[in-house]
Amino acid sequence: MFHRFMIGDIAAMMISDGPLRLARPHRIFQSVDPAALADALTHAGQVPDRILVEQNCLLLETGGKRALFDNGMGTDTMFGTESGRLLANMREAGVDPASIDALVLTHAHSDHCWGTMGDDGTPNFPNATIYMAEAELDFWGEAGNPAQDEISQRGVQKHLLPLRERIVTIRDRQSFLPGVQAWLTPGHTPGHLAFLIDGGACLTGDVAFHDPLSYLYPEARCAYDTEPEVGVETRRIMLNRLVDERLGVIGYHHPWPGLGRVERFRDSYRFIAGA
């Protein structure tokens, strides 16, 4: 499954790695009435008792380079058996994984970087330079840090640290690819990045990962955030910027293909798909 589109003059494509089955809503969106969460999900046409999300990987053709942003779960099935489709969908779209020049990571959680390495220990994108935040690499590269979750730490050891010589760290506001600027958006992880793309779009990563709950309840502490209070503040900053600057949203976990915009709605926000 893939979807071609343009961001200004930049050719883009969304490529699916397939859906994930996450925890029950009240276990993720903390401090929100479970009944309110269920009602919001039902109103959105989603199942009320489980968080189901997509994995929409962005491919850009920019400045003679082919850049892939995040790469899904790989072959791991801890969030269900329907993920791990990225490589097959790339080939269906006519994209050879060996043609990827830049592998760009919003952060190092399982569903964003476990497609980096194959089960045999060889890179799935053998010619790619890996770009990620310096703060993210420092955080996950520090063994024994009690703030790390064990599953993500194991994944970093398998998928990223063996390729350390290919990793280039990037900083907030750095334009590291033609038409692409990094935006440090901490909270979900210490070095989480969003990306601003010339032509008026923002790849938001996991700052506001769920449509509609992240928009209706931006102040809710998220169980997946390393620093939940920082995550709340970052989410408010991001959502206000998306609205004020009228940026198009590229949502990694949003309903396929994850494209739309954000508007203010009552005392919170809402995502308008396809706009």
Model region roles, listed by residue range:
Residues 2-92, 194-207:
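Conserved beta-strand hairpin/beta-sheet module of binuclear metal-dependent hydrolase folds
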Residues 67-69, 104, 130, 201-203, ...:
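Residue-level marker for buried hydrophobic side chains located in beta-strands
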Residues 72-74, 109, 136, 186, ...:
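Catalytic metal-binding/acid-base residues of hydrolase active sites
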Residues 79-80, 114-124, 261-262:
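Metal-dependent catalytic neighborhoods of phosphoester/phosphodiester hydrolases
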Residues 80, 198-275:
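Cap/insert and terminal regions of metallo-dependent hydrolase folds
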Residues 84-95, 99-111, 126-184, 230-246:
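Metallo-beta-lactamase
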Residues 112, 181-194:
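Active-site glycine- and acidic-residue-rich loops that bind
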